[in-house]
Swiss-Prot record:
It comes from Ruminiclostridium cellobioparum. Keywords: 4Fe-4S, ADP-ribosylation, ATP-binding, Iron, Iron-sulfur, Metal-binding, Nitrogen fixation, Nucleotide-binding, Oxidoreductase. [4Fe-4S] cluster binds at C94, C129. Homodimer. The gene is nifH. It holds the Pfam family Fer4_NifH. Binds 1 [4Fe-4S] cluster per dimer. This is Nitrogenase iron protein. The modification ADP-ribosylarginine is found at R97. The key enzymatic reactions in nitrogen fixation are catalyzed by the nitrogenase complex, which has 2 components: the iron protein and the molybdenum-iron protein. GO terms for biological process: nitrogen fixation. GO terms for molecular function: 4 iron, 4 sulfur cluster binding; ATP binding; metal ion binding; nitrogenase activity. It is an enzyme of class 1 (oxidoreductase). It comes from the Bacteria. It catalyses: N2 + 8 reduced [2Fe-2S]-[ferredoxin] + 16 ATP + 16 H2O = H2 + 8 oxidized [2Fe-2S]-[ferredoxin] + 2 NH4(+) + 16 ADP + 16 phosphate + 6 H(+).
Amino acid sequence: MRQVAIYGKGGIGKSTTTQNLTAGLGEMGKKIMIVGCDPKADSTRLVLGGLAQKTVLDTLREEGEDIELDTVLKVGYAGIKGVESGGPEPGVGCAGRGIITSIGLLERLGAYEADLDYVFYDVLGDVVCGGFAMPIREGKAQEIYIVCSAEMMGLYAANNIAKGISKYANTGGVRLGGLICNSRKVDGEADLVSRVAKEIGTQMIHFVPATMRCRRRKSIKRQLSTFRPMTQADEYRTLARKIDGNDMFVVPRPMSIDRLEAILMEHGILD
């Protein structure tokens, strides 16, 4: 079973990317579980046909700890299983603790004992800190993919996340599998993201063109099954195949901020 975490800057498209690429893997016959690690609880909505899912933390607050697995785990497109960690009540507690609580509960309820090929963690966080680092810190995720674009904050976040991976690589065994460029129509962005990937010792595993990016439709089925060939769906199917066949897993070499800014200036991102 491969355990994969998807990180990246807030709003970069982690949840859309995760759900579409897992749908592609599901169409390949892979058995998958998505664990949403974001208080917004939108990591499984598309694969569940647009339906909101009750979160683990909400369920625990309302029903206590004596719950069954199917109370918090739902099955959607291509047999993909989905769980949402959720978050604390607004203004109270730490959202990162919700990830720790949720993964612990899933382990106790036997979710990881199923015949799974992949577990994907869709993780909130521009920086890898606290509970949001749990999939990395505790060795739950062995491979990380960072969704980014050729913009300063997207690449700054990617470099920060690489620092977190590097920090926990020896204790947790986690490795970076590559950068996924979610295009924002920036001039020369494939070259820039590839340059940054090379600089930190990894690869740009796939480039999703801006004209191919999926808008948030109500369901994955409509996204992956109703388009002509070589459209959005095929981009994510290609990404799924690349991740399934990927064998490049590295301990990244994060850059200093000065080095990152120098590269951005070379590419005209900073004046």
